[in-house]
Amino acid sequence: MLYGYQKPLSGEKVGVVFGSFAPLHQGHLDCIMRAKKENDGGCIVIVCGFDGDKGGEMMPLKRRYRYVREFFADDDLVAVYAINDGEIGAKPYPDGWEQWLDEFYKIFEKAVEKNYIDSSDSTLKQYYWPKRHWYAGDVNYVSDLIERGEEATLLDRMADNPICATMIRQNPIKNWDKITFPFRRLFSHNILICGTASEGKSTLTTDLGKYFNAPYSYEYAREYMKDSCVVDWELDGADYMAFLEGQYNLNRKLISSPSNHGIFFADSDSMVTRMYAEYYAKDPTCALTEEEFKQVANMADAITAKCRWDKIFLIAPHGVFVDDHERYMAHSGMKERMELYEILVKNLKESGNWDKVVILNGDYYENFMAIVHYVREVMAR
């Protein structure tokens, strides 16, 4: 694997902790913190695995390596590296130790500084490597390492902190507080509330966020238009691209925020922006051209492919279109709203998200309670 520069550890002795970290959790931190404090040189953390391992598509080895590095980025006593069994040709455990340790020894020489022996003769510089002490939660790993001349300590991680990665993967919300921050974004249950204009989406999203004490995003496009003093028919390709980037970054920031305890509500996303762009590009009174729409559509599709929605509540057109002096009233009729709705349905289907969609046809309170019941079920699993 490729490694960026990390400041080498220095000291007489370093600890070593290795694991798949799918995800990194408090139980792992117990081991790492002990290794860091019991050895003056700190701790080397090795993220292990192979392509298609227990991390699956959600947590492939390269992503786990990145997130573990992110978690320890401000800790000078922890050096994070990774070993991909497939890349080094290591056989499945227990037969792959020789190849695995050969790779580790190469990493070790990058991860630590040599200790030099003071000598009055500057031409005779002598040095030695820091000692190593391994920490593992599997008795077989400890025995194997000792047989190969390494120092190793067996830790009972479940004794003080009864958590394991399997428990988190099976029920992340129940074990949310045990998941380290970089990995939480992967387990967040993300709920999108979408539809055409004036269907109560923004109020619904805000009320749900407050009800569940969960982070929620606003519709970035509306704030952008207020700040830029621009109206719907003036929007061009650059504006729509700004909508796409702004909404994506806003949603991503909230999903990754410390305020997220497992549930996130979004008021809009790239599929909604694409809906408006496609519709307005066909209207000669609007600034957006068909050629610009192609560029917007490509960007929207690329962003949609990067987003993960666990449930999408689609509000069908109903009721009276409210004139808030910001919406484009030329498209306020039921015919126009249904045309927009059909475009959004198409976008949801073509993006592969239709199986996550629940269509809401009730009044505001009925829609609110439908989502509340769903979220309660998710939290009770």
Regions found by a protein language model. Give the residues of each.
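Hydrophobic positions on the alpha1 helix immediately C-terminal to the Walker A/P-loop
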Residues: 204, 208
